């Protein structure tokens, strides 16, 4: 919890406004004595992750959706908002539902604000040491969309199940945010688990088929 002190205020009414949270928090406070304490409770930024399939097979493409809320950055000279995503060895990032592999160290994802008809394409950075890790920096996008503060948004992207998939394929995402570069908050990873079932192939000998 953070606390702030304001000194030498004249008596009267003050609008106290909390920023940096995913929900706008404010309170009209009357100052009518020398000392007064108020408490504002805001929800810290967070993300949730979902997959469009409950079970998958090798070769299938899974659509992942991350949902977040545009935080209020009023009064901040800078604000960091980065989404980190890590796949297991049984998944590979792909560009579409057809399973096209990325060709560059940039990976395109779709970002859409709730209630808006159009989405925008943003580029995530692929970790040079691990092609199954990406970082999506939405810091500038968050600042540019303060007219939508408090609204939810979604990030959509795809991953293909490969031959290294085990019984369960895990995919985790976490958020990195804050207005102080030296004191950035990292959320607990949100893990999506998708059971994987191998494709069973039975070979039939021609003579057995005719018998």
Question: Where in this protein do the model-derived segments appear?
Answer:
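Short, surface-exposed beta-strand/beta-hairpin micro-motifs centered on an aromatic residue
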Residues: 2-8
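Serine/threonine-enriched low-complexity regions used as flexible
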Residues: 8-31, 66, 79, 140, ...
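Extracellular beta-sheet/turn segments enriched in Thr/Pro/Gly and aliphatic residues
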Residues: 22-23, 30-49
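A short, amphipathic beta-strand motif
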Residues: 49, 85, 199-206
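Short, solvent-exposed loop/linker segments at the N-terminal edge
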Residues: 54-60, 193
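A surface/secretory-pathway sequence property marking extracellular, secreted
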Residues: 81-135
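Short, ordered, surface-exposed loop/turn motifs in non-cytosolic proteins
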Residues: 208-211
């Amino acid at each position: 919890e953070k606390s702030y002190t304001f000194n030498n205020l004249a008596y009267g009414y003050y609008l106290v406004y909390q920023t940096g949270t995913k929900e706008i928090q404010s309170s009209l406070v009357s100052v009518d004595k020398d000392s007064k304490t108020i408490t504002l409770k805001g929800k810290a930024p967070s993300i949730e992750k979902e997959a469009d399939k409950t079970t998958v097979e090798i070769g299938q493409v899974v659509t992942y959706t991350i949902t977040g809320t545009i935080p209020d950055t009023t009064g901040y000279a800078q604000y960091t908002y980065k989404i980190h995503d890590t796949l297991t060895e049984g998944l590979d990032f792909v560009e579409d539902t057809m399973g096209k592999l990325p060709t560059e160290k940039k990976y395109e994802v779709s970002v859409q604000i709730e209630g808006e008809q159009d989405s925008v394409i943003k580029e995530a950075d692929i970790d040079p040491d691990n092609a199954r890790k990406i970082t999506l920096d939405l810091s500038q996008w968050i600042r540019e969309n303060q007219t939508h503060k408090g609204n939810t948004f979604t990030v959509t992207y795809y991953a293909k199940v490969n031959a290294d998939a085990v019984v369960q394929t895990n995919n985790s995402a976490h958020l990195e945010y804050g207005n102080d570069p030296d004191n950035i908050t990292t959320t607990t990873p949100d893990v999506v688990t998708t059971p994987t079932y191998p494709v069973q192939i039975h070979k039939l000998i021609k003579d057995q088929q005719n018998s």
